[in-house]
Design a protein with these regions (language model features):
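Glycine-rich phosphate/adenylate-binding loop and adjacent beta-alpha elements
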Residues: 1-35
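Short, acidic/turn-prone active-site loops that include or flank metal/cofactor-
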Residues: 107, 125-130, 165-166
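A short acidic, Gly/Pro-enriched loop at the edge of an enzyme's catalytic core
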Residues: 128-138
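Glycine-rich phosphate-binding loop and adjacent beta-alpha segment
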Residues: 145-166
């Protein structure tokens, strides 16, 4: 039923001590409902990005359902310019029509990569241009204590924070 609420749940490669090996183990036991067969039309070089794309799409759809304004009219901050942050940004801008978005990351190379694909302002998080109480929606794709605090500072009163990173 609600496995995600179980106090004794075990997550692949995530529990300490590790009780269940992760995805790089030689063999892994996974419940049937968690296995998806990839379509034959999906190329092998595209398959690895299916999971992060699904995670990003799910997060964007959660934000869309939870917030009263449309995504295209919302001011959005994405904390983290890695795979999930970039994919979330792509879905927000290319699919949902979000016009005002900012991506923050410590890594200059990631910010440059994001700016190639997104029409979004890219900044390091210590920049004075990251505004407090400014954003309708904040996506934290990093999941560290410091990024949680950045999200709390950046979101407007009444805005929402979507925590994606673990």
């Amino acid at each position: 039923g609600n496995e995600h609420l179980c106090g004794k749940r075990i997550i692949l490669g995530m529990n300490k001590p590790i009780e269940r090996q992760g995805g790089f183990a030689e063999y892994v036991s996974i419940p049937d409902q968690n296995i998806y067969e990839l379509p034959k039309t999906l190329e092998m070089k595209e398959a690895p990005i299916a999971e992060p794309t699904a995670v990003s799409l799910h997060a964007v759809e959660l934000a869309e359902k939870a917030y009263y304004k449309s995504l295209k009219d919302s001011k959005v901050l994405v904390i983290g310019g890695g795979a999930i942050g970039l994919l979330s940004g792509l879905i927000l801008s290319k699919v949902k029509g979000c016009k005002e978005m900012m991506i923050v990351d410590l890594n200059e190379k990631r910010l440059k990569e994001c700016s190639k694909y997104l029409d979004a302002q890219t900044l390091k998080p210590d920049s004075k241009n990251v505004m407090n109480d400014h954003f309708d929606i904040v996506f934290d794709t990093v999941g560290m204590e410091v990024t949680r605090q950045q999200a709390i500072k950046a979101v407007k009163p009444g805005g929402i924070i979507i925590h994606i990173g673990l």
